Amino acid sequence: MDEPSTALSTREIENLFEIMRQLKKDGVSFIYISHKMPELFEICDTYYVLRDGKLVAYGRFDGIDENGITEQMIGRQLADDDFSNHVCVANDQVAMSVKNLTGQGFTDISFDLHQGEILAITGLQGSGRDAVADALFGVIPYTGTVVVNGKTMRPGSISGFMRNQVAMVPRMRKERGIHNDLSIYDNLYMAYLNTKFKRLLIKKSDMDQRFGRQKEALAIKTENAKNPITSLSGGNQQKVILGKWLEADADILLFDNPTQGIDVGTKFEIYHLILKLAKAGKAVIVFSQEFPELYKVADKCLVLYKGRINATLGRDELTEKNVMYYSTGANLEVEKHA
């Protein structure tokens, strides 16, 4: 079973696991392929770890913890990836100001995003999180205002957001983030050509230099840049998507479920890249419902519930308990019965 829970809700995953347990009792065996560590520990008995196409470790889940598995997958000690000391590097300059943003699935969303800041926006499925992400890249219409570097954006205009230095690394990477029929090379410099290129003719040596720079900086693993983008792993595809926006020199980057469906090692690389972008003065918004992801990178977190901001959590308030409390609207029930 290859990533069977990717498009399932929590309830549906529980139902799937119950069916698997029953089939196991009947003598059915499973090979379960997933990047979601909690699922593996819940449903699997034994594990095999592959890295760079080779078997590097195997054993039983009852003899190891998540850190041990992760270290085997990435090939290094997790002590090198301690995000607990993350310090906000934001300045006072507002990169994006959102006021009373309202559209299908969300209402009255307002916040300021500063240069060097990493803002997380989270919420359960149906909270409006995905729709807000789309609105902030001009994918869907909205009312209210979005001001980018002092300029008011036109709702529903992707090209307008792109021209004003807003970039998106989208969810559903294969459907929305890459051009499946084009090569790795062509995918990487596409945003640059659309937003920055002013000449009539393309200078191949310039494009080669740009590709080489991003390939090295992002550690994109490919034998041939002319291979189709679909020949890459999910993690390397995600790096290409990020690389094309870095080449376009975007000021504001929207990461919508940035590590969905990629391996643990590449996840850590993406987290470090996000922190590096913030240190370089970029403004970043990360849309995710995975708490470990939020905790690793966020300076501040907006928690959505039924399309509205239910809480704004600072770094010192960002705990899994608080995120779930406000994501489920539990605070509203407490207020109702107070």
Regions found by a protein language model. Name each.
Residues 1-338:
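Glycine-rich phosphate-binding loops of nucleotide-dependent enzymes
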